[in-house]
Amino acid sequence: MQYNEDARRREIRKGEHRNMDYEKLIATLSRKGYHGYFCKDSAAAKKLVMEELLAGVRSIGKGGSASLRECGIWDALLEQDARTDEERIELFSTTLYNSQGKDPQIALEKGMTADAYICSTNAMTEGGTFINIDGVGNRVGAMIYGPKKVILVVGKNKIFPDYETAWDHLKNVTCPKHSLHGSGKSACAKAGRCVDCDNDNRMCCITSILDRALPDREYHIVIVDEELGY
């Protein structure tokens, strides 16, 4: 889709286009087979995830996520991984493994068979569709064919009225920012928008669209009334 910077899209990106009907959104998620939760802020989301959704979980895979860092869940997971008692939750994260001098590929593989997987989503629509772009595929793979319990933490800035506006934001805001925080070598990082590049530095190699919860998996969608990630 060609880049479109009209006024309506700018408003949507700034989150100024509407008041969110969270009750309706949670009901839509429930109808589609998801477990939906509304949290007023990051502190409430962190408490819900760490004290309730991860109860009984002993291992967890984690996808790269600015949202998890910003709401404090990343630090809480590191603390759990560092424990030495029976309550420890072993964390499989490439960031953690790299910092420890371990092979990050092992974290990717173990994350696919962990008790749970946690990340954010690149975008979701008010109709309950989740859209994700990946360069390697570990995150989208784990979300649809990995652990039986999947937890997505979603800030209000990632919720869009429809697929078209979500896709426009992904290609022209999310991907360039992700690349800038990574290698910065992609064409979109340099241009600040999608230029539909076709080379080895392209970061949006894989796109997944999840229209409904898979019947053999638990999806826990934590909606936070704050802007998290991009």
Report residues per predicted region.
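N-terminal active-site beta-alpha-beta segment that forms phosphate/nucleotide-binding
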Residues: 21-108, 113-118
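Short, functional N-terminal and low-complexity linear motifs
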Residues: 12-17, 42-43, 132-135
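Short, Lys/Arg-enriched N-terminal segments with co-localized hydrophobic residues
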Residues: 3-19
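N-terminal start-of-chain detector that recognizes signal peptides
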Residues: 9-10, 31-34, 88-92, 103-105, ...
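Exposed boundary/loop context
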Residues: 2-8, 121, 130
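N-proximal short alpha-helices
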Residues: 18-22, 139
